[in-house]
Amino acid sequence: MFSRRNLLALGLAATVSAGPCDIYEAGDTPCVAAHSTTRALYSSFSGALYQLQRGSDDTTTTISPLTAGGIADASAQDTFCANTTCLITIIYDQSGNGNHLTQAPPGGFDGPDTDGYDNLASAIGAPVTLNGQKAYGVFMSPGTGYRNNEATGTATGDEAEGMYAVLDGTHYNDACCFDYGNAETSSTDTGAGHMEAIYLGNSTTWGYGAGDGPWIMVDMENNLFSGADEGYNSGDPSISYRFVTAAVKGGADKWAIRGANAASGSLSTYYSGARPDYSGYNPMSKEGAIILGIGGDNSNGAQGTFYEGVMTSGYPSDDTENSVQENIVAAKYVVGSLVSGPSFTSGEVVSLRVTTPGYTTRYIAHTDTTVNTQVVDDDSSTTLKEEASWTVVTGLANSQCFSFESVDTPGSYIRHYNFELLLNANDGTKQFHEDATFCPQAALNGEGTSLRSWSYPTRYFRHYENVLYAASNGGVQTFDSKTSFNNDVSFEIETAFAS
C-alpha cells in the first residue's frame, strides 16, 4: 500500500520539474499567491516575475524566467541596469490571481519615502545562483516594504491557509516586523488574530524561542508566537542557516511552525497544535491582505531578505510541505557575488579620489568625525595626508565586502548614521558592523569604483557639497538628488598619501 506522500510523489513524477505550486496543487491546497524574483514556482510559468525601474530615466521593464518553470533572466536585469541603479517596483503573483506586491502605503506607521510610502528594494542587494544560474533576491533594509491590500482568494476569518518563504537566516534584526503573509486590509492594527504571517528575526518583545535567535515565529497581530504560549517557547530553535525555509499554516483551532535549511535536509516541526489560548486568536479574524518585509500596521523597522514564497488555500499536509522542501533543496540556492569592478585587497592602504568634473583634486578625508572631501596633493601636510588615507579591511558585516579604517585614527571606521558618513570607533555591535560595511562595484560613471552600502544597497558613498553621505539615486533627502549622481558616487582608487 502506498502512503499519501508516495502517491503524491508518483503523481508528480508525470510532471516535468514540478514547481512548489504544482506540488501544493497536487496536495489539494493550491497556491493563491506565489512570489519570487529568483525563479518560476509553477513548471509552466513563463510570465513576468518582477518589474524594475532604473534611476537614469525612470524607465521600467519586467524580468521573466529564462524558460518556462525556470530561473529568472538575471542577464536581462544586468543589461537594463548597466551604469545606473535599479529598484524592484513590483513582485508579480504567479498564481493568476493578480496578487502582485507593490510599494507599501502608509498605515499605522508612515514609511520613509514620499507621502509616507515605504522604500523600494535595490535590485542588486541579494545576488544568488540557483543550480549555477545567477538570480537576485529582495534585500530589504529597514523602511522597505511591499503590500497588496486587495488580494483575491486569500484566507479570511478562520479559513485555513498555508505559506512558506525562503529567506536569508543571517539578515535580520529585532525590530518589528519582517513578515510575509496574511495581514490587515487597512494597513492598521485592527486587533488580535487579524494576521497570520511568517516572521523571521530576533525580537523578544512578544514571543521568542531557544537561544539568541533569530527565530521563525508567526505574527498573529499584537503578538509574535513561537509556540502555544505568549513569550518563551523552548521548542522554537534559533536559526543559523544562510538560506532558510520557513513554513507556517493555520486553520480552525490549529496552526504550525516548521523550518529547515533551504539548501539541504528536511523540514522540522517547531510547533503544531491548538491556537493560543488568549483573547482574539481562536477563532481567528484574518483579513487577507498580503505583506512583505513589514508588520500589518506598516511597522517598518525590520530587515531581511526574501527569495520566494507562496500562500495557499487550505491547510497543507506535512507530506505536501516536505515535497516542497525537497523542491527548494533541489533548486540549489548558493550565495552570489556582491562585488564587481576594480578590486580592493584587505590590508592595503588607499586614497579615494573624486571623479566629478571640477572636483577631481579632492579626496575622501575626514575632519574629526565628519567624512568629507578635501583637496590633497604631495605638498599637503602630513596630517591631511593621513586624514585622506584609509586601510581596507574585510567587511565587518560581510566578508565579500569591505570596511575602511582611518589611518590616523586606528580602530575608527567610515560608517553611515542617518545616512551621513561618519568616522566612529568600532563599538563591536552588529549595528555598527552593518553600518560600516560597503560593497564595491564598477563605477557608475565608468571611472574607478562605486561603494554601495551593504545594509542599504540603494545607497552609495556620495560627495555632496564636499560632505560624504550614503545617498540614493533620487529620494527625499537633499543629498539624494539625481543631478550628477553617477559622477558623485564614482571614485578612483589610488595609492595612499600615507600608510
Curated annotation (Swiss-Prot):
Disulfide bond entries: 21-31, 81-86, 176-177, 401-439
Subcellular location: Secreted
Site (Cis-peptide bond): 176-177
Temperature behavior of the protein's activity: Optimum temperature is 55 degrees Celsius.
Catalytic activity: Hydrolysis of terminal non-reducing alpha-L-arabinofuranoside residues in alpha-L-arabinosides
Induction of expression: Expressed in the presence of L-arabitol and L-arabinose, and repressed in the presence of sucrose and glucose.
Keywords for the protein's UniProt record, in alphabetical order: Carbohydrate metabolism, Disulfide bond, Glycoprotein, Glycosidase, Hydrolase, Polysaccharide degradation, Secreted, Signal, Xylan degradation
UniProt-listed SUPFAM superfamilies: AbfB domain, Concanavalin A-like lectins/glucanases
Matching CDD domains: beta-trefoil_ABD_ABFB (cd23399)
Region (ABD) location: 336-499
Gene3D superfamilies in UniProt: 2.60.120.200, 2.80.10.50
Region (Catalytic): 18-335
Active-site residue list: 221, 297
Chief location bin: secreted
Role summary: Alpha-L-arabinofuranosidase involved in the degradation of arabinoxylan, a major component of plant hemicellulose. Able to hydrolyze 1,5-, 1,3- and 1,2-alpha-linkages not only in L-arabinofuranosyl oligosaccharides, but also in polysaccharides containing terminal non-reducing L-arabinofuranoses in side chains, like L-arabinan, arabinogalactan and arabinoxylan.
Entry comment, domain topic: Organized into two domains: an N-terminal catalytic domain and a C-terminal arabinose-binding domain (ABD).
Similarity annotation: Belongs to the glycosyl hydrolase 54 family.
Protein name as annotated: Alpha-L-arabinofuranosidase B
Species in which this protein is naturally found: Aspergillus kawachii (strain NBRC 4308) (White koji mold)
